[in-house]
Amino acid sequence: MYKEDVYMLAYERIKSAPGNMTPGSDGTTMDGISMSTIHTIIQEMRTEQFQFKPVRTVYIPKANGKKRTLGIPSTRAKIVQEVIRLLLEGIYDSPNGPYFHETSHGFRPDRSCHTALREIRGKWPAVNWFLEGDIQACFDAIDHGVLVSLLRKKIRDERFLNLIWKLLRAGYLDLQEARHDSLAGTPQGGWASPILANVSVHELDEKAEEIRVRWERGGKRKHRNPLPRKLSAQKERLVKKGETRTKEFRTVVQRIRSIPAVEVNDPNFIGIN
């Protein structure tokens, strides 16, 4: 937390991000940051005097007609939050051995909805059911005490944890500029919030994995589906007859592509992803 290079890296990472020229809760913008500002922040870190200002609240329209709360932090807080994110990423998402589950794709380096879809396509053959869920107001509902206790599983530096406490408890300004306490949640719009949410949601992944192991049985499906073989034989007969342009041939090919090679209703096999 005291190395100048880390703060310079944080500044370079966020200075050109969309929306970062929007004035923060202190009225300043990223182009007002200087080396003197960074030196002041580092000194305040050493003496534990750095304080996060309340975030400025704005409301962003959602596709369903509702509005999402977005907190705009002060310019100095943006840099410190990015430093926190960089450090947490090194702890929880190191290339040498990430803490998060391999199946977790949200708010992680080199991962996205596209990588999640590629994994489903490549590793989840013959899936019968998908369970869709949504964590309502995920960022807003995170319990501060529970989150910090989870962080303590990996982090022993109480100064760093105290800085995260300050971030969580910074409060917010409403549209009338009145200050309110932050009793729960991580500020949406904050650079550190996504990875803090991942630390919390990781416990859900752990529980899901526990359930998967408990209910899954049978390493591989043992019963092969006889229908694809019959259809393949029918296809070969049509090829030998030269009837590859017929409706019957197209139907057979389509059925071969759509029918799984193994028996999906095998009672001795339950596969869960």
Question: What is the meaning of each model-derived region?
Answer:
Residues 1-273:
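Non-catalytic terminal/accessory segments
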